[in-house]
Curated annotation (Swiss-Prot):
Subunit record text: Interacts with ITGAM; this interaction inhibits ITGAM degradation via the endosome-lysosome pathway. Interacts with ITGB4; this interaction prevents ITGB4 degradation.
Keyword Cell membrane included in the entry's annotation: yes
Region spans: Disordered: 245-267
This protein's name: Transmembrane protein 268
Main function: Stabilizes cell surface expression of ITGAM and participates in the adhesion and migration of phagocytes during bacterial clearance.
Keyword terms, alphabetized: Cell membrane, Membrane, Transmembrane, Transmembrane helix
PANTHER family on file: TRANSMEMBRANE PROTEIN 268 (PTHR31193:SF1), TRANSMEMBRANE PROTEIN C9ORF91 (PTHR31193)
Organism: Mus musculus (Mouse)
Length: 342
């Protein structure tokens, strides 16, 4: 099975390799030609693994060799645990399967059938006209509601996903200085759920400088808006709590025999609200913003879902926004629509 090389969003055709899909396979490609210049938004390589295999792991060693062929020295040890712990936990893998396009399509079909049956049976119960009128009413209503549901699904896919995109914050933070961004997508091939980890080249220094200046300007003139937007960049995390075992005050009150062991209790946990972009110097906040939304930007880039722009700052294509434009407009902007899909 071949991995189709997608069109390079950055304007230059990056060699996307072919592979046989397995539980731990990296597509192998030919090294780029000598002197070939990398462009912002250029796909470097893609890791593809079968999500139905257990256990699975990314072949990041082979990815390291592929990046070295492009002249990028990134030791896999710097981000191996960050990427695998973020994406390969069982609950995350199940979420990717249930959130896949075929599952959404199946849900829409079931929703259509249930709505149609309920509306038709209701129309017959109250004898609203003849049989064909009931069929037409049920069909139009079910189609309209199902189309609305599909549009809601599609709109959610254009938002940053806290269960996939934002889990790559730590990995992208480690790769920013190497001019590499990670993003994750999923697809279904046959009966296999496939996780795709994308490596995209992007020199973010200009974006860091612009966002740093923009954050500094917002601190001076729009501090309330900045605080409001950053307050939405938080996730709920569970942390373990060590229970405090209190012994008897008097040793004479202690039982001579140990108590009967009961069923194993669940570990105690507490939920904490973690701020993804805490208050700091403008440059540090700019780098953190790029790390937080790097996975989101990469997913939109490789799936051609980035919003169209009339001009770009740091991309070769005039109609593709760069990361700082996306963050400026859709994260720090004055829009009322939420940008996170919980």
């Amino acid at each position: 099975m071949a991995c189709e090389p997608p069109t390079d969003p950055g304007g230059a055709a990056g060699p996307l390799p072919t592979s046989t899909l397995g539980c731990n396979i990296l597509p192998q490609g030919n090294p780029p030609g000598w002197g070939q210049e990398l462009h912002n938004g250029q796909v470097l390589t893609v890791l593809r693994i079968d999500n139905t295999c257990a256990p699975i792991s990314f072949d990041l060693g082979a990815a390291e060799e592929q990046l070295q062929a492009w002249g990028i020295q990134v030791p896999a040890e710097q981000y191996r645990n960050l990427a695998e712990s973020a994406l390969l936990e069982p609950q995350v893998r199940r979420y990717i399967i249930y959130n896949s396009r075929p599952m959404r399509l199946a849900f829409a079909v079931v929703f259509y059938v249930l709505v149609w049956a309920n509306i038709y049976s209701t129309s017959q119960m109250f004898a609203l006209g003849n049989q064909w009128a009931g069929v037409l009413l049920a069909t139009l209503a079910a189609f309209s509601l199902t189309l609305t549901l599909v549009l809601v699904f599609e709109r959610q896919q254009r938002k940053a996903n806290t269960n996939t995109d934002l889990r790559l914050v730590a990995a992208n933070g480690a790769l920013l200085r190497h001019r590499v961004l990670l993003g994750v997508t999923d697809t279904v091939e046959g009966c296999q759920s496939v996780i795709q980890l994308w490596f995209v080249y992007f020199d973010l220094e200009n974006c860091v400088q612009f966002l740093s200046d923009h954050v500094q300007e917002m601190k001076r003139s729009q501090e309330s808006l900045l605080r409001s937007r950053l307050s939405q960049l938080c996730v709920v995390m569970e942390t373990g709590v060590s229970p405090v075992v209190e012994g008897p005050e008097d040793l004479e009150d202690a039982p001579l025999l140990p108590s009967t062991p009961g069923p194993q209790e669940r570990p105690l946990t507490q939920t904490e609200l973690y701020q993804l972009v805490p208050e700091a110097e403008p440059e540090e906040m700019a780098r953190q913003l790029l790390a937080v939304f790097g996975g989101y930007y990469t997913r939109l880039l490789v799936t051609s879902r980035l919003p169209q722009s009339m001009g770009t700052r740091h991309m070769d294509s005039a109609r593709i926004p760069c990361p700082c434009q996306l963050i400026e407009v859709h994260v720090l902007g004055t829009g009322c629509c939420p940008f996170l899909a919980r």
